């Protein structure tokens, strides 16, 4: 049975990174199988050759860590679009910002929400200015900075992720190591391995 799937992400082309590449490959592969896949991604306010399946939600001028656009009042925009698409499944790729929108819309429209855990988020805290400062202090042997950073990594982030993952109907781990990492979270949501695919041309040489 063919499905209508909404992919939701905080970064996408023209941004270059592992998550945008993974989303594009997955969307293309699912379309080749006959499914309809719509991508909800931030507006980078720069020229990009989008197709009719890509929806760009509004963003603010400033960016997180100089690269990730901050969504600007996007719930209404995404909700209006979803209400016209008859979506069967929401596949979200980030737990914050668009992640909150995805789970809220999924609940409101009774649409299952799945989430791919692409990133060990605690490893990227230092890209945010306050935590980058603490990381520098910790590297210099400052015990207070190290303690605060450790608390943020082990308590704040994990508690937030626990709550988010419990709102999803399924979690995909790209690797077994990520699946093993998530097991101590003790969530009721099923965690299955779904590796990131490679284009078939990679195997033709």
What are these regions (language model features)?
Residues 41, 142-204:
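Donor nucleotide-sugar binding/catalytic pocket of nucleotide-sugar-dependent glycosyltransferases
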Residues 116-155, 159:
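Acceptor-binding helix/loop patch of EC 2.4 sugar-transfer enzymes
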